[in-house]
Design a protein with these regions (language model features):
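Nucleotidyltransferase catalytic core that binds NTPs
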Residues: 1-130
Length: 130
């Protein structure tokens, strides 16, 4: 957990309007996004929350714990990944927005990296750029 927090600190150095929460990092219980967002919203009820995910994750979002509650708690920002079908993404977008989710899909630069890739690079002292 401390490695993930350190990676975030490095990635966000000099960036304003970002804050790191360790709610999930040091918990002994399984972490669920709906629980984490509940805690964040309770502690900071006037803040807006944005959940950045790979667009491929939209497909599986309905399977997440307490999905219908979760989609009311934040705005999702879906980032396309190379090799992922835009048609599948559009179908997933249509499904989750019909269910009530707010999803931003913009012209973000494609990012061919996952959290698994970042952890591997960090643990092996490899350079992570941009």
């Amino acid at each position: 957990a401390s490695h993930r927090v350190n990676m975030l600190r490095l990635a966000l150095q000099g960036k304003e309007n970002f804050d790191i929460s360790c709610i999930e990092a040091y918990s002994d219980e399984p972490s669920y996004s709906v629980k984490t967002l509940s805690i964040l919203r309770k502690n900071n009820p006037d803040d807006n929350y944005y959940f950045i995910i790979g667009a491929d994750s939209l497909v599986y979002l309905p399977d997440w714990k307490d999905y219908l509650t979760l989609i009311t708690m934040c705005t999702f920002i879906a980032v396309m990944r190379p090799g992922f079908s835009k048609e599948i993404c559009k179908a997933a977008y249509d499904k989750v927005t019909k269910d009530g989710a707010t999803v931003i899909m913009g012209d973000f630069p494609e990012c061919d990296i996952s959290s698994t890739d970042i952890r591997f690079a960090f643990e092996n002292n490899l350079i992570i750029d941009n």
